[in-house]
Amino acid sequence: MGESRKHIELVQIAVEYVKNIVPAEMKMLVQYDSADTKRPPMISGNYIPDVYFWNNTLLILGEAKTVDDFERKHSREQFKSYLQECNHFFGKTFLVVSLPWQLVPTAKNYFRRLKKEMNCSTTIVILNELGRRFEV
């Protein structure tokens, strides 16, 4: 099934953010599903993040969600799986979630609860469609 235009735009926002926080010489290692790069690998739980970066000291998983996607059971299971993957990584970890502005308050509350429930130290970055950043 093809991705919606909105989802593609949200993925691009996450990609741009990730490329800005990785070392300059490693930007080409940022993986995302496009003609320009290798598709991200499947991680625990058999999920494929929209954006992926890994080196010895840093793991970044990125996911874009539209208004219709965020509340779905599949999305919630993805987020838990991504945080489990981050919990098993020895180094700095980020989960970057890009979504429409109206979901930001809900997402912040959800991820605060989820981090506490999972005893997770991963930095969760929420980006709205304008690229505004919120950290949980």
What positions do the PLM features span?
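Active-site metal-binding core of divalent-cation-utilizing nuclease and nuclease-like domains
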Residues: M1-H7, N20, E25-T57
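Short, non-transmembrane alpha-helical segments in secretory-pathway proteins
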Residues: A14-V18
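Structural alpha-beta junctions
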Residues: K19-M26, N87-F94, L114-I126
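Domain-level recognition of nuclease-like catalytic cores that cleave nucleotide substrates
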Residues: V96-V136
